[in-house]
Amino acid sequence: MPHRSRHKRGSSGSVRPATKTIPPWLSYSPEDVERLVVELARRGFTPSLIGVILRDQYGIPLVKIVTNKRITEILEENGLKPQIPEDLMALIRRAVNIRRHLEEHPKDMSAKKGLLLTESKIHRLIKYYKRTGVLPLDFTYSPERFAMAT
């Protein structure tokens, strides 16, 4: 498992398919896969969970191999793309939970350090997403606003 504030990656995780071709045993057409992605998104699953469900339950190794589109591209075409990217939202949820913990345990210094590292990462990601046009330029992170939303 990697550390949150280091630039190295962890060693655990599933191995991506070796070939970039559609497996011969796959019985789903690109339209079927897109329909499944949209259906799962409407049921409230995040893009990463959609990929896991398609891999584990439907045997679809990679959506991009089959459809030539990423899951978020399919969701964007159908108007289902989340306003805030999934990785940023996960960090915001983590920061909200740490703040909630610190309200009950104000002397927990390791939690304070964790909050500092998490919020630093949030600010770096927001800067990146503004630069690439994913988030609007007037987007700001305020812990109070997101504490109510989550």
UniProtKB/Swiss-Prot annotation:
Subunit structure: Part of the 30S ribosomal subunit.
Organism field: Caldivirga maquilingensis (strain ATCC 700844 / DSM 13496 / JCM 10307 / IC-167)
Entries under Pfam families matching the protein: Ribosomal_S13_N, Ribosomal_S15
Entry keyword set: Ribonucleoprotein, Ribosomal protein
HAMAP family reported for this sequence: Ribosomal_uS15_A
Recorded family membership: Belongs to the universal ribosomal protein uS15 family.
Gene Ontology biological-process annotations: translation
Molecular functions per Gene Ontology: small ribosomal subunit rRNA binding; structural constituent of ribosome
GO CC term, one of those recorded: cytosolic small ribosomal subunit
Residue ranges, annotated region (Disordered): 1-21
Designated name of the protein: Small ribosomal subunit protein uS15
Alphabetical list of Gene3D superfamilies matching this protein: 4.10.860.130, S15/NS1, RNA-binding
